[in-house]
Amino acid sequence: MMKHAMILAALAVWPQIATAQEGDYDPAATQSCLAAAKGLDGQRACVGVSAEACADAATGGFSTRSMTGCMASEYGFFDEMLNVEYAKVRELAADLDKQDNGTSFDDVSMGDRLVQMQRAWIVYRDATCAYERRQFDGGTIGELIHVDCLATLTAEQAFRLQNNVLGL
């Protein structure tokens, strides 16, 4: 909800020239939100929390430019989280592959399926966010839309892996 308010605020200042410097991004608010989150909806509500605080504190004030920079940092936070969760699930998949008793519906290992899934997901994320960005060509708001999309979808994938995509 907060990130949508952030995008609407950017639309309100759209005609203004973005002169703000990027704020100092601190992931603490997002980390705290995630620690207190109840379920997937709670986790989703945390996306953009630190980015909004960062943009509010930006030199020159809340602007499209500051929001874009801060959301890019939030994307980096969730990308790192995704990489950590992916490594955990990959390790679990490797362990399960060692225990495979031949009951799989095909001869492809769980680890290989995980890699295939993640590669396909990256293509999906990048295409989806490029499409969303394309709808706003001609202005800086498109950059914010793009990085917000990247952060949101990356966070969703991290949550999916963290909440145990293997169903165990």
Residue map of PLM features:
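Positively charged n-region of N-terminal signal peptides that target proteins for export
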Residues: M1-A5
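Cleavable N-terminal signal peptides
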Residues: I7-L8, A18
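A broad, structure-centric signal for solvent-exposed, well-ordered loop/edge residues
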Residues: L8-A9, L168
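N-terminal signal peptide c-region/cleavage motif recognized by signal peptidases
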Residues: V13-I17
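N-terminal alpha-helical modules
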Residues: A20-L168
